[in-house]
Amino acid sequence: MGDERGDGRAGRFGGRIALVTGAGSGIGAAVARRLADQGAQVFAADVDGAAAATVAGELPGSHALTMDVADPAGVDRAFTAASAAHGRLDVVVHAAGVDDPAAKEWLAEALLDDRPPEVTTRLGDDAWRRVLRVNLDGTFHVLRAALRVMVPRRSGAVVTVGSSSAFDTLAGYPHYAASKAGAHALSQAVAKEAIAFGVRVNTVAPGPTQTGMAQRTPAALRRGLAGPRVRPYAAPEEIADIALFLASDDAANLVGAVLLANGGRFTV
């Protein structure tokens, strides 16, 4: 596009309105910054409203939204407010998600003790539902809200952030793997429906990435995910760049794609 940014330079997303979930930190924050740097006006949404406000405060013309993706009414309110401000949303990147620090500790303990992990028998319903509620239900809430805004205009691009764990999970991390595999399948199913209305939906599936979630991962487990034959943990900006590609006109022929970005740990 030939749109001009505020600094006079053309931006790939110049003149576009974007909403990013999980924008208070990690991949979401990197996506919000990249979009703003390339000309978009960004709504930075996060369950941590203060973190969202901090990121939005760095970005010209951007706004913060407090939004819990597990709360469908809250998601609808946020999307309504964002779309009402400009009459549309052109790009949505859904990067919000959670892990399970307790399960990671159990995995690390098993690794240090040189024994097989036993997590499923210890996993409570509350822990299972928390991960599925945010990672899978939250993806549905965001996709539904995005399509409600984009379908009437017959235009838009949605990118969901999945995980390489959907393909090859750690032994002993079943709820996270299930949530991300479900989110991938959901995104692909919605993509096949939405393209008839001019809306593209795609997914980026990162491997280990240097985020707050990774920092909470026990050191023993982090070492197990590293190695000389693979790339180091990705920077959030590397994953953000893939998300921006999927959201851009350069990816116009990609619909329902799941791009694996795991540094060579495995292929599919």
Where are these regions (language model features)?
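Short C-terminal tail/terminal secondary-structure segment
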Residues: 2-9, 168, 255-268
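Residue(s) in the substrate-gating loop at a strand-loop-helix junction
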Residues: 163
